[in-house]
């Protein structure tokens, strides 16, 4: 593909017919300005997609519906939360929001319809300094003028456990795939304090690790939105990212969660119905975002992200091979789905949008007969049918009878072995698990989380009880400014 | 006192407890089930494999006593194991069904000849009646002729359309109203992914149904292997030493399906349970009701009495799918002759177009 673009000086932007084209997207040649416009318009279209969002983003004035005071208050209270991961998408989205604020400021004599709070989550101490440095660089280079309208908050997601008044132990019974849970009111059952990394270390594969981390991060963001009265969370997901999310949810047995995770119409019911979730970049491919990111100089602020130059007229010539060396076995489900879309984008360009559109057509599942819809103790997703019942209905869990003396002998040895294991172990996880199985109550886990728990070393996990207390226990944040060291 | 060393024949290596089957805890585990990662022994594997299929049959009421059931037998591993297990379960649990092996001879030289020979041996081995219908008999076309005319790219879909109706027609001729096929969990999962990737909304909700019947056909179809992993079917055939023909259909899937298949292989490599997980997802799919478009939701009721004008086969359309397809083939056979004279002219009325029309008809 690159060969045909090598004579870049011949290419003219097809929008303005003046400037040289720097990006080729959807079979059209764009100059940097026209492409920025193209992407920006698509984001703004999503931000104006219905009345609720229009009320947030538009600059309000006194009219039939509201007094001057009301209008002023509405502008002031239109707070949106923007999670920033320092990947290309969230940086680009923030850039477009900044432009929107600047434009409003100019056309409305200093007034804006909304304010932006950026939330940056981290769990690894080492990355903290780089985040601080990048934020201060960003503010100085880009957001000085909107100093009052865009604020940056740093949240340490290790608070996940410290921040939870009640912990529970969730244990999977292998025989019937039922989940037993026990509230650990008396935390002394566990000798030392639990940390997020200890829980994450129990994951047997990278996929599960990333899923748990993603949940904990999302939980922190939504909890923050709940506690600080935000009207909406603007997620930076590109169309490509949403497509890989849809596929990954299906592959993880979480297909029933697709409709709720793509839902931008309703308030988030897991967090007190206080805010909605919006995906302003859902009409834009990741390759397009990367092109925007690079052409706007935003690539200087990326952390742990490699930009794709597929649509750029002048290739960046960076060592993209590095990403590919990660072997197939080490990839997560999301990464595999992402790879698939990256490869397929050339030959079947509409597959990505098809997947997102199809995902959008899915409704909330019907609940199984005689099944009371409940919520997953782990991921808070709604459960529409009993996973353990489904699994046991398609999985036989009895064996072929014992026949020979040797077999009977082996069986006896196995029994003794297990008894010894139980006797000799201290109050560790094995003991605790047996205790929970005997004394715990039946808990609800969604199908996906049941499968996740099955891949854990001990088939168990200690997890916060997601209740009102937990939701209201204050999440500490740290405000970042432009003068970090 | 002298003790004789024990007879070396009786010395056996004592199995470590961790090597034991996780179900019976008494025999050596030799298989790790992809479904739940359980390590089990051979005898327990036979038991769970057969019992799970039995459970699927019973909980979905697939059969009724006295029903005559045709097993679509291709000689491949899926259908061979299906014939074997169905016969076994029918005897073990007394379903009271009558099983007939039904084979279609597409006329694929080299592939079909050998696989038909396998089916014929299966007939002897399992003592089940066998009926063979050929494309030549049913459509006056062989698969090799079709490929020559339609191009190899579309052959699998063609093959599917024709084979599907061929099985139905064959069953109808035998006055059998139920065809069981060896579609397994892997096929099911692939279909779910394909329907999402292609945006095939019309088929999305039904991607995972165990029982289907195509429009225009009085024959119902079921898939007792819906929850069986391909890998376990192969293992079962292997350990039971079943006689099957191991070569896959020589006509490769169309390119896009190929990409989906590879994607699924990759998923499976990092998470073996994903096949059943995808089916779990697929079973939850419900489409949003379109608002303000109620008038569009008119249900086209199928008149049972309709028959194809050409061949008399039951069909909701004036001309049945197979006849449509054959008409297209006739056209393109003529066109190929023209195209030889006018090279470079884009093919307008080709089989691909007919195929698209046909696919729309299916909904
Ligand atoms: Zn331009
Ligand atoms: Zn869950
Ligand atoms: Zn066993
Ligand atoms: Zn016909």
From Swiss-Prot, chain A:
UniProt pathway: tRNA modification; 5-methoxycarbonylmethyl-2-thiouridine-tRNA biosynthesis
Gene Ontology biological-process entries: invasive growth in response to glucose limitation; protein urmylation; pseudohyphal growth; tRNA thio-modification; tRNA wobble position uridine thiolation; tRNA wobble uridine modification
Taxonomic superkingdom: Eukaryota
GO MF: nucleotidyltransferase activity; sulfurtransferase activity; tRNA binding
Ranges annotated as spanning the membrane: none
Keyword annotations: Cytoplasm, tRNA processing
Compartment list: Cytoplasm
Intrachain disulfide bonds: none
InterPro entries registered for this protein in UniProt: CTU2, Rossmann-like_a/b/a_fold
GO cellular component: cytosol
Keyword Magnesium in annotation: no
Keyword Cytoplasm: yes
UniProt similarity note: Belongs to the CTU2/NCS2 family.
UniProt function note: Plays a central role in 2-thiolation of mcm(5)S(2)U at tRNA wobble positions of tRNA(Lys), tRNA(Glu) and tRNA(Gln). May act by forming a heterodimer with NCS6 that ligates sulfur from thiocarboxylated URM1 onto the uridine of tRNAs at wobble position. Prior mcm(5) tRNA modification by the elongator complex is required for 2-thiolation. May also be involved in protein urmylation.
PANTHER family: CYTOPLASMIC TRNA 2-THIOLATION PROTEIN 2
Full protein name: Cytoplasmic tRNA 2-thiolation protein 2
UniProtKB/Swiss-Prot annotation, chain B:
Cellular compartment(s): Cytoplasm
Its EC number(s): 2.7.7.-
Primary location class: cytoplasm
One MF term in the entry's GO annotations: nucleotidyltransferase activity
Cellular component per GO, a single term: mitochondrion
The organism's place on the tree of life at top rank: Eukaryota
Gene3D superfamilies the record matches: HUPs (3.40.50.620)
Pathway assigned to this chain's UniProt record: tRNA modification; 5-methoxycarbonylmethyl-2-thiouridine-tRNA biosynthesis
Any one GO BP annotation for this protein: tRNA wobble position uridine thiolation
Keywords for this protein: Cytoplasm, RNA-binding, Transferase, tRNA processing, tRNA-binding
InterPro entries attached to this UniProt entry: CTU1-like_ATP-bd, CTU1_C, Ncs6/Tuc1/Ctu1, Rossmann-like_a/b/a_fold, TilS/TtcA_N, tRNA_thiolation_TtcA_Ctu1, UPF0021_CS
Keyword Transferase (UniProt): yes
PANTHER family linked: ATPASES OF THE PP SUPERFAMILY-RELATED, CYTOPLASMIC TRNA 2-THIOLATION PROTEIN 1
Family: Belongs to the TtcA family. CTU1/NCS6/ATPBD3 subfamily.
UniProt cross-references to NCBIfam families, sorted A to Z: TIGR00269 family protein
UniProt function note: Plays a central role in 2-thiolation of mcm(5)S(2)U at tRNA wobble positions of tRNA(Lys), tRNA(Glu) and tRNA(Gln). Directly binds tRNAs and probably acts by catalyzing adenylation of tRNAs, an intermediate required for 2-thiolation. It is unclear whether it acts as a sulfurtransferase that transfers sulfur from thiocarboxylated URM1 onto the uridine of tRNAs at wobble position. Prior mcm(5) tRNA modification by the elongator complex is required for 2-thiolation. May also be involved in protein urmylation.
Protein name, per record: Cytoplasmic tRNA 2-thiolation protein 1
Taxonomic source organism: Vanderwaltozyma polyspora (strain ATCC 22028 / DSM 70294 / BCRC 21397 / CBS 2163 / NBRC 10782 / NRRL Y-8283 / UCD 57-17)
Lineage: Eukaryota, Fungi, Dikarya, Ascomycota, Saccharomycotina
């Amino acid at each position: 593909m690159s060969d045909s673009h090598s004579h870049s000086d011949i290419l003219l932007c097809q929008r303005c017919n003046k400037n040289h084209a720097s990006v080729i997207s959807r079979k059209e040649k764009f100059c940097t300005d026209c492409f920025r416009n193209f992407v920006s318009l698509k984001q703004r279209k999503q931000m104006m997609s219905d009345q609720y969002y229009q009320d947030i983003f538009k600059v309000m004035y006194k009219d039939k519906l509201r007094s001057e005071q009301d209008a002023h208050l509405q502008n002031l209270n239109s707070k949106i939360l923007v999670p920033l991961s320092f990947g290309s998408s969230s940086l680009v989205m923030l850039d477009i929001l900044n432009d929107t604020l600047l434009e409003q400021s100019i056309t409305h004599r200093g007034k804006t319809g909304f304010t932006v709070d950026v939330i940056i989550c981290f769990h690894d101490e080492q990355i903290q300094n780089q985040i601080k440095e990048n934020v201060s660089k960003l503010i100085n280079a880009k957001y000085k003028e909107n100093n009052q309208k865009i604020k940056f908050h740093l949240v340490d997601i290790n608070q996940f456990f410290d921040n939870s008044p009640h912990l529970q132990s969730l244990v999977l019974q292998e025989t019937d795939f039922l989940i037993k849970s026990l509230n650990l009111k008396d935390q002394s059952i566990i000798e030392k304090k639990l940390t997020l990394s200890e829980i994450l270390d129990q994951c047997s594969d990278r996929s599960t690790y990333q899923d748990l981390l993603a949940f904990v991060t999302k939980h922190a963001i939504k909890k923050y939105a709940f506690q600080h009265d935000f009207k909406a969370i603007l997620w930076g997901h590109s169309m490509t990212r949403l497509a890989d999310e849809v596929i990954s949810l299906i592959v993880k047995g979480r297909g029933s969660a697709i409709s709720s995770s793509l839902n931008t119409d309703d308030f988030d019911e897991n967090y007190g119905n206080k805010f909605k979730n919006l995906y302003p970049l859902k009409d834009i491919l990741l390759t397009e975002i990367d092109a925007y990111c690079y052409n706007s100089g935003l690539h200087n602020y990326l952390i742990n992200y490699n930009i794709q130059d597929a649509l750029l007229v002048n290739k960046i010539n960076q060592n993209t091979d590095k990403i590919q060396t990660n072997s197939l076995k080490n990839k997560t489900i999301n990464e595999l789905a992402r790879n698939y879309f990256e490869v397929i984008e050339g030959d079947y360009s509409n597959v990505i949008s098809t997947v997102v559109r199809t995902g959008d057509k899915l409704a909330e599942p019907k609940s199984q007969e005689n099944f009371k819809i409940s919520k997953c103790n782990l991921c808070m997703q709604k459960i529409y049918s009993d996973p353990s019942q489904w699994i046991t209905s398609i999985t036989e869990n009895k064996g072929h009878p014992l026949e020979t003396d040797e077999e009977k002998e082996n069986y006896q040895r196995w029994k003794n072995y297990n008894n010894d294991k139980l006797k000799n172990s201290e109050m560790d996880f094995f003991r605790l698990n047996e205790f929970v199985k005997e004394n715990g109550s039946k808990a609800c886990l969604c199908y996906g989380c049941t499968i996740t728990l099955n891949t854990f070393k001990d088939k168990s996990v200690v997890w916060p009880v997601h209740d009102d207390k937990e939701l209201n226990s204050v999440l500490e944040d740290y405000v970042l400014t432009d003068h970090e060291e | 006192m002298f003790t004789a060393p024990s007879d070396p024949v009786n010395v056996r290596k004592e199995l470590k407890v961790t090597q034991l089957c996780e179900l019976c805890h008494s025999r050596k585990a030799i298989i790790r089930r992809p479904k739940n990662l359980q390590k089990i022994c051979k005898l327990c594997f036979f038991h769970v494999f057969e019992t799970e299929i039995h459970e699927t049959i019973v909980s979905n009421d697939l059969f009724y006593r006295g029903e005559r059931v045709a097993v679509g037998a291709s000689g491949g591993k899926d259908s061979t194991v299906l014939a074997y297990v169905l016969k076994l379960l029918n005897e073990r649990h007394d379903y009271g069904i009558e099983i007939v092996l039904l084979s279609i001879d597409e006329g694929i030289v080299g592939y079909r000849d050998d696989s038909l020979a396998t089916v014929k041996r299966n007939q002897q081995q399992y003592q089940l009646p066998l009926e063979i219908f050929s494309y030549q008999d049913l459509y006056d076309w062989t698969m090799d002729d079709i490929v020559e005319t339609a191009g190899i790219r579309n052959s699998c879909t063609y093959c599917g359309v024709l084979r599907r109706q061929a099985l139905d027609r064959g069953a109808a001729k035998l006055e059998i109203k139920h065809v069981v096929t060896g579609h397994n969990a892997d096929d099911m999962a692939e279909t779910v992914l394909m329907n999402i990737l292609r945006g095939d909304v019309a088929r999305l909700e039904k991607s995972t149904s165990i029982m289907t019947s195509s429009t225009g056909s009085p024959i119902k179809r079921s898939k007792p292997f819906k929850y069986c992993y391909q890998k376990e079917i192969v293992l079962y055939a292997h350990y039971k030493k079943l006689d099957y023909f191991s070569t896959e259909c020589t006509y490769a899937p169309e390119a896009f399906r190929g990409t989906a298949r590879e994607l699924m292989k990759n998923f499976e490599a990092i998470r073996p349970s994903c096949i059943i997980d995808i089916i779990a997802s697929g079973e939850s799919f419900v489409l949003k009701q379109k608002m303000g478009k109620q008038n569009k939701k008119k249900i086209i009721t199928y008149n049972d009495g309709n028959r194809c004008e050409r061949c008399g086969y039951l069909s909701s359309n004036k001309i049945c799918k197979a006849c449509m397809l054959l008409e297209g083939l006739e056209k393109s056979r003529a066109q190929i002759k023209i195209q030889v004279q006018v090279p470079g002219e884009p093919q307008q009325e080709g089989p691909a177009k007919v195929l698209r029309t046909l696919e729309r008809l299916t909904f």
